Amino acid sequence: MRLPQARLDQVLDRFREVEARMGAATDGAEIVKLSKEHAELRPVAEAVERLAKLSAERAELDVMASDPEMAEMVRDEIQALDEKLPVMERELALMLAPKDKDENASAILEVRAGTGGDEAALFAGDLFRMYQRYAQTQGWRVEIDSISEGEMGGFKEIVASITGDGVFGRLKFESGVHRVQRVPATEAQGRIHTSAATVAVLPEAEDVEIEIKESDLRIDTYRSSGAGGQHVNKTDSAVRITHLPTGVVVTSSEKSQHQNRARAMKNLKARLYDMQREALDSARSEARKSQVGSGDRSERIRTYNFPQGRVTDHRINLTLYNLARIMEGDALDDVINPLIAEDQAERLASLEESFS
C-alpha cells in the first residue's frame, strides 16, 4: 500500500508539536494528556522516519543501478529493499488505520449457559476454563466476580475480570453464541446433543468515561450460596446493584461486602460502557456490516464438534481439527489470530478508502 506523503508528514508534524507542548506545559492534567498522546504517536513517528530513510536508500540505489558498472553490485541490495519496503508500509498502514480505542483495555468476561439444560451449563464451564487457561498463557490475571453453578456441574452463569495488557483486543471476537455438538455424560444411548452458551467480552471502563448517579442505583444485599444451595457466609455479604434507568443488574458474591460493592460497580460501568459502544456501533452498522466481531450476541459464531475433534468459526469459514488443544487454551490463538488478521484487513481497506 502506497501511503500518501501528506498523511505521513501530518503524523510527524503532530508528534513534534506534542513534544514541544510537553516541554512548555505546566498544568498537570494537560501534561498527562500530552504524555499519553506522545506515547501513542512515538512508535508511528519512528516508523515513518524508518520508512523515509529506507525509501531514500532505495532511490539512491536506483541512481547507482543506472551505471552499468554498478548495476550488478547493487542488485542484491535492491532486491532486499524491494522485499522489506512493502512489509514496512503495511505495518505503518496498520498503525494509521482506525483503531478500537479499547484495544489495550482489560475486560469483563461473561459466560452463560444457553439452550441445552445441564449440558449447556457444563459447556459454559468448559468455555470459561478455556479462557482461564488462555489468560494464564498470556500472563493476565483472572478474578471471578460472580458465579451461579449448574446442578450437574459447570455454570449457569459466571462473570470474571481479566486484567492485563491487550485483553479486550484479543478476546473481543469471542462475543457471541458458541454451539457444542457432543455426547453428554448423562446420555445412556450415545446420542449426540447440541447445546449452546453465550459469551460477552466487555472493555473495562475507565472511571472518567462513565458517570453513574447514586440516585440511579438500587443496592441490595443478600446471602450468597454455593453449589447445592449451601450457605457460604453467616452474614448477608453478596451485593446486587440495579441501575434503574436501564434495568441493568450486576452482582458480586465474594466474602467481603465492601469488595463486592466495588466489583459490582466496576462491572456495572463496563456493562453501561458496552451499551454506549453498541449504540454507537449500531449507528454505523450499515457501513460496517461485514466487520468481524460486530458483537451481535444473537449470532452463532462458532461450533465445537467433539466427535470430529473439529472447531469451526462461521464468521471467517475457519475449520480446525485441534479441538482438544483449543479447549485447553493452548491453541486458542489458532482461532484468534485469523480473526485479528481479518479485522486488520478490514481496517486497511477502510484506510485505503479514506485515501481515495
Curated annotation (Swiss-Prot):
Superkingdom to which the source organism belongs: Bacteria
GO CC terms of this entry: cytoplasm
Post-translational modification: Methylated by PrmC. Methylation increases the termination efficiency of RF1.
Keywords: Cytoplasm, Methylation, Protein biosynthesis
Composition bias type Basic and acidic residues, residue spans: 279-289
Entry-linked Pfam families: PCRF, RF-1
InterPro entries in the cross-refs: PCRF, Pep_chain_release_fac_I, Pep_chain_release_fac_I_sf, Prokaryotic/Mito_RF, RF-1
Keyword Cytoplasm listed: yes
Region (Disordered): 279-299
Keyword Chloroplast belongs to the record: no
Principal localisation: cytoplasm
Family matches, as SMART domains: PCRF
Location in the cell: Cytoplasm
Molecular-function annotations in GO: translation release factor activity, codon specific
Modified residues (N5-methylglutamine): Q230
Stated role: Peptide chain release factor 1 directs the termination of translation in response to the peptide chain termination codons UAG and UAA.
NCBIfam families hit by this protein: prfA, PRK00591.1
Family per similarity comment: Belongs to the prokaryotic/mitochondrial release factor family.
Name of the featured protein: Peptide chain release factor 1
Record organism: Caulobacter vibrioides (strain ATCC 19089 / CIP 103742 / CB 15)
Gene from which this protein is expressed: prfA
